[in-house]
């Protein structure tokens, strides 16, 4: 119990060589402070290193290098084990020669011979070679010939483009331009109303006249926010409109950011009631896409040609319809 098998002589020699190399290498590594500056070794370290290398060279020259211990310093074993070379006796050599000669005599001779190739003529007539009569190699090769179809193919003339498709595309483009134009007008109208509200908050009710009409420009009296072309306040008016538009975009971006972070306005409300409202609206909507487009276009026309109160109601209806469509999809 607890006993280990005895080590062989080769293992003991390898371990002894490793211990010897560790002791010799320990003397070569400088220990402690090298010099006062710490840059150069002292003479004692140099002599110790030279003495150690002389001892290693002496062991290597005498052949007393232990087997396998050279891996410690990266040297090969100076006395490797030689591979024994096979030794042939004269009788075995003669017997092998006789066996090879007998094999050569008993082996059957080769019967396959290559027939001599005839020298081709230098010139060929058109009737001698079918490749010369055809225009290309693909026409004579059977793999590249077009086989006859098993099923007859009926070729139909290409269909001509109808004018209705082209006219429909032009009409859709004109409708898109018309809708974009009216939307731009309505957006400018909304921005002007917001600008007028902004001016009314910062100015008294009796002093709503433009402050730039007395600067010498030949323009008629007008209110602030409705400056005509040529008035110095025209640029300031559109600058205020641009600032209001940027503020609206900033508010929309903030709502989108809150939506991405999960703290939306709908999240603060009762989601069950909102989803029930959207589901009821989506159940009333037609399933045909053309009917939905016609409904939205009709609501857009009503919004563009109605008063402010009606526009508010139509806008709320459009938002509810779009939300219901989003919820349905």
UniProtKB/Swiss-Prot annotation:
Glycans are attached at residue 261. Residues 92-109 have a biased composition (Basic and acidic residues). Residues 2-237, 186-237, 313-329 are cytoplasmic. GO terms for biological process: membrane fusion involved in viral entry into host cell; symbiont entry into host cell; virion attachment to host cell. It is found in: Virion membrane. GO terms for cellular component: membrane; viral envelope; virion membrane. A lipid is attached at residue 2 (N-myristoyl glycine). The keyword Lipoprotein applies. Residues 2-164, 259-291 are extracellular. Residues 61-129 are annotated as: Disordered. The large envelope protein exists in two topological conformations, one which is termed 'external' or Le-HBsAg and the other 'internal' or Li-HBsAg. In its external conformation the protein attaches the virus to cell receptors and thereby initiating infection. This interaction determines the species specificity and liver tropism. The large envelope protein probably also assumes fusion between virion and host membranes. In its internal conformation the protein plays a role in virion morphogenesis and mediates the contact with the nucleocapsid like a matrix protein. The large envelope protein is synthesized with the pre-S region at the cytosolic side of the endoplasmic reticulum and, hence will be within the virion after budding. Therefore the pre-S region is not N-glycosylated. Later a post-translational translocation of N-terminal pre-S and TM1 domains occur in about 50% of proteins at the virion surface. These molecules change their topology by an unknown mechanism, resulting in exposure of pre-S region at virion surface. Belongs to the avihepadnavirus major surface antigen family. Large internal envelope protein interacts with capsid protein. This is Large envelope protein. It comes from Duck hepatitis B virus (strain China). The gene is S.
């Amino acid at each position: 119990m607890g006993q280990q098998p005895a080590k062989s002589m080769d293992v003991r020699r390898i371990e002894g060589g490793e211990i010897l190399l560790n002791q010799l290498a320990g003397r070569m590594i400088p220990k402690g402070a090298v010099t006062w500056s710490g840059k150069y070794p002292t003479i004692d370290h140099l002599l110790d290193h030279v003495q150690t290398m002389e001892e290693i060279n002496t062991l290597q020259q005498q052949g007393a290098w232990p087997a396998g211990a050279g891996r410690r310093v990266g040297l090969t074993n100076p006395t490797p084990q030689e591979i024994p070379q096979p030794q042939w006796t004269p009788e075995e050599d003669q017997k092998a020669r006789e066996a090879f000669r007998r094999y050569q005599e008993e082996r059957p001779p080769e019967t396959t011979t290559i027939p001599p190739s005839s020298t081709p003529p230098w010139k060929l007539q058109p009737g001698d070679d079918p490749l010369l009569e055809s225009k290309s190699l693909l026409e004579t090769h059977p793999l590249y010939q077009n086989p006859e179809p098993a099923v007859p193919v009926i070729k139909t003339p290409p269909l001509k483009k109808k004018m209705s498709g082209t006219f429909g595309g032009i009409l859709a483009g004109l409708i898109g331009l018309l809708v974009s134009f009216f939307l731009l007008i309505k957006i400018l109208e909304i921005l002007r109303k917001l600008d007028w509200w902004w001016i009314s908050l910062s100015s008294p009710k009796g002093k709503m006249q433009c402050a730039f009409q007395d600067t010498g420009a030949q323009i008629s009296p007008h209110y602030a926010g409705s400056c005509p072309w040529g008035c110095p306040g025209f640029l300031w008016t559109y600058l205020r409109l641009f600032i209001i538009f940027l503020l609206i975009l900033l508010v929309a971006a903030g709502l989108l950011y809150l939506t991405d972070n999960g703290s939306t306005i709908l999240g603060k409300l009762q989601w069950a009631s909102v989803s029930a409202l959207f589901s009821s609206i989506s159940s009333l909507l037609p399933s045909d896409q053309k009917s939905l487009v016609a409904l939205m276009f009709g609501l857009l026309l009503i919004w563009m040609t109605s008063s402010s109160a009606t526009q508010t109601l139509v806008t709320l209806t459009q938002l509810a319809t779009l939300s219901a469509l989003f919820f349905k999809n």
